[in-house]
């Protein structure tokens, strides 16, 4: 029986997605607030830098593991302000999270040119060569089979299409690393209990971050999936990294 990690626990591969779904369904209504509290607001700066990696907004963009829609809605607003003809597809396996994204899109009057699809990153319901950009922010570490998801990204991107991933990474500086680990394992779950009423969900999230491959390890995984010109950029001392690659 194939096993994989659900945080620090070993679980049957076929059960992980359901467990992850439960985590996000249980915290969906507090997700955005928790992001602000956990990152001390830094996630907004990280995401702003992330969308700068997309210079051409007259494009077909797929945002995978879209969650509450932060990345897609930032792109939609930027495109509207510049009068660009953007086409955005928001995909997430968790319907509750997509409901949050739809609500935000309506509230911000950004619903035009948006499509919403409930789908697994491992089995995307799109034809080959469909998108100019594939974005995924803080989502790929939750996928049961990351290699399979990377190959799907490769498949749905057009030739010369760009893969862009924002994910928690490995801090190298000693004093930052020590503080970050203490904050992650001791403070974040407590905030999760106080705000979202779910300490276990945030223990899983912290553990999943700790287990995610290093910047260089993930770069190799991306290259092995079939991408070229693979690179990454550290933000905030390596707390997160932006990974990018192209389809030739």
UniProtKB/Swiss-Prot annotation:
The keyword Membrane does not apply. Keywords: Menaquinone biosynthesis, Methyltransferase, S-adenosyl-L-methionine, Transferase, Ubiquinone biosynthesis. Pfam families: Ubie_methyltran. It comes from the Bacteria. Pathway: Quinol/quinone metabolism; menaquinone biosynthesis; menaquinol from 1,4-dihydroxy-2-naphthoate: step 2/2; Cofactor biosynthesis; ubiquinone biosynthesis. GO terms for biological process: aerobic respiration; menaquinone biosynthetic process; methylation. GO terms for molecular function: 2-methoxy-6-polyprenyl-1,4-benzoquinol methyltransferase activity; demethylmenaquinone methyltransferase activity. InterPro entries: SAM-dependent_MTases_sf (IPR029063), UbiE/COQ5_MeTrFase (IPR004033), UbiE/COQ5_MeTrFase_CS (IPR023576). It catalyses: a 2-demethylmenaquinol + S-adenosyl-L-methionine = a menaquinol + S-adenosyl-L-homocysteine + H(+); a 2-methoxy-6-(all-trans-polyprenyl)benzene-1,4-diol + S-adenosyl-L-methionine = a 5-methoxy-2-methyl-3-(all-trans-polyprenyl)benzene-1,4-diol + S-adenosyl-L-homocysteine + H(+). The keyword Aminoacyl-tRNA synthetase does not apply. Its EC number is 2.1.1.163, 2.1.1.201. S-adenosyl-L-methionine binds at residues 68, 92. HAMAP family: MenG_UbiE_methyltr. PANTHER family: 2-METHOXY-6-POLYPRENYL-1,4-BENZOQUINOL METHYLASE, MITOCHONDRIAL (PTHR43591:SF24), METHYLTRANSFERASE (PTHR43591). Methyltransferase required for the conversion of demethylmenaquinol (DMKH2) to menaquinol (MKH2) and the conversion of 2-polyprenyl-6-methoxy-1,4-benzoquinol (DDMQH2) to 2-polyprenyl-3-methyl-6-methoxy-1,4-benzoquinol (DMQH2). Belongs to the class I-like SAM-binding methyltransferase superfamily. MenG/UbiE family. This is Ubiquinone/menaquinone biosynthesis C-methyltransferase UbiE.
């Amino acid at each position: 029986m194939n096993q994989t990690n659900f945080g620090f626990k070993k679980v049957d591969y076929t059960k992980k997605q359901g467990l992850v779904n439960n985590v996000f369904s249980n915290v969906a209504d507090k997700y955005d607030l928790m992001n602000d509290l956990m990152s001390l607001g830094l996630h907004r700066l990280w995401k702003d830098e992330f969308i700068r990696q997309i210079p051409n907004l007259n494009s077909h963009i797929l945002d995978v593991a879209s969650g509450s829609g932060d990345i897609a809605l930032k792109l939609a607003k930027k495109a509207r302000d510049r009068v660009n003809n953007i086409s955005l597809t928001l995909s997430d396996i968790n319907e509750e999270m997509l409901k949050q994204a739809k609500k935000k899109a309506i509230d911000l009057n950004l619903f035009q040119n948006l499509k919403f699809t409930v789908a697994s990153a491992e089995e995307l319901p799109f034809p080959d060569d469909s998108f100019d950009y594939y974005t995924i922010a803080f989502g790929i570490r939750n996928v049961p089979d990351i290699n399979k998801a990377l190959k799907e990204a490769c498949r749905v991107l057009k030739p010369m299409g760009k893969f862009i991933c924002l994910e928690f990474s490995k801090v190298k500086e000693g004093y930052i690393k020590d503080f970050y680990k203490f904050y992650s394992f001791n403070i974040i779950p407590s905030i999760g209990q106080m705000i979202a009423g779910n300490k276990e969900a945030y223990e899983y999230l912290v553990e999943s971050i700790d287990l995610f491959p290093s910047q260089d390890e993930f770069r190799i995984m991306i290259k092995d999936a079939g991408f070229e010109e693979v690179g990454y950029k550290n933000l905030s001392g390596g707390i997160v990294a932006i990974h990018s690659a192209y389809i030739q």
